[in-house]
Amino acid sequence: MVSTMMNEQQQGGMTHGYNVEALKNKPKSKPGKATDTCLEVSDLQLWYGQDKVLKGVDMEIPRGRITAFIGPSGCGKSTLLRCFNRMNDLIDNCRIEGHIRIDGEDIYDRRVDIPELRRRVGMVFQKPNPFPKSIYENVAYGLRLQGVRNRRVLDEVVERSLKRAALWDEVKDRLHENALGLSGGQQQRLVIARAVAVEPEVLLLDEPASALDPLATLKIEELMFELKEEYTIAIVTHNMQQAARVSDYTAFMYLGELVEFNDTDTLFTTPAKKQTEDYITGRYG
């Protein structure tokens, strides 16, 4: 049993893979909050050329929760995440079969407005990618693309979005300075502010803290707890401590297959599959 192995491997609350205390101390979701399905994935298969990368993935991602995707490098985590807003469409020789539905709508239907889909499903990448513009213009960028020109509206949305991203107090007196002058952690929170400014339903975070120092990582994690009150969040992480700390649900992937998907506490303490147990206890990966 995993619990037995944890006792053997524990050193100051740590296992090879993650901190078991994180499960005890993690803020819990508010009771009574809806847990209906936001994203439904059915028999999803994906090829890059002749290379089959995703192999019949089936899952339902609950609304208003944080779902973490873990697994060794190359297992298909990020590829799956990019399917949720069709970023893989930009890759040559990519072919997809199966279905992904948001609120019952198949996002791979040919009638889907892809720019609108990417507004509804925002994405933040591993490396912060602010535009070489002012802090203000970074946040206002998506609104301007939508045709918003009213300065009062822009001001309100910029302030609200920066507050949501826990960045307002740090930048409110320098909004017209170049965003590239911010620290790495501030840049990543700015990118999150830019994403939430257009009022998405889902936020996809692909290793959002892997390039940041521990303090900046903590701020990103605290921000995720706050944002899940308004958005459904899916995060890819190689850091199992982070998955245990921040997520409500965890999906373990291996070689393009979804091996196990369960609430985080259960998956990390009593996994149903031996592959999952081996991975979270450091036997491979």
From Swiss-Prot:
Residues 39-280 form the ABC transporter domain. ATP binds at residues 71-78. InterPro entries: AAA+_ATPase (IPR003593), ABC_transporter-like_ATP-bd (IPR003439), ABC_transporter-like_CS (IPR017871), P-loop_NTPase (IPR027417), PstB-like (IPR005670). It is an enzyme of class 7 (translocase). Its EC number is 7.3.2.1. It is a peripheral membrane protein. SUPFAM superfamilies: P-loop containing nucleoside triphosphate hydrolases. Pfam families: ABC_tran (PF00005). It is found in: Cell inner membrane. GO terms for biological process: phosphate ion transmembrane transport. Keywords: ATP-binding, Cell inner membrane, Cell membrane, Membrane, Nucleotide-binding, Phosphate transport, Translocase, Transport. Gene3D superfamilies: P-loop containing nucleotide triphosphate hydrolases. GO terms for molecular function: ATP binding; ATP hydrolysis activity; ATPase-coupled phosphate ion transmembrane transporter activity. One of its GO terms (cellular component) is plasma membrane. The complex is composed of two ATP-binding proteins (PstB), two transmembrane proteins (PstC and PstA) and a solute-binding protein (PstS). PANTHER family: ABC TRANSPORTER I FAMILY MEMBER 17, IRON EXPORT ATP-BINDING PROTEIN FETA-RELATED. Belongs to the ABC transporter superfamily. Phosphate importer (TC 3.A.1.7) family. Part of the ABC transporter complex PstSACB involved in phosphate import. Responsible for energy coupling to the transport system. This is Phosphate import ATP-binding protein PstB. It comes from Alkalilimnicola ehrlichii (strain ATCC BAA-1101 / DSM 17681 / MLHE-1).
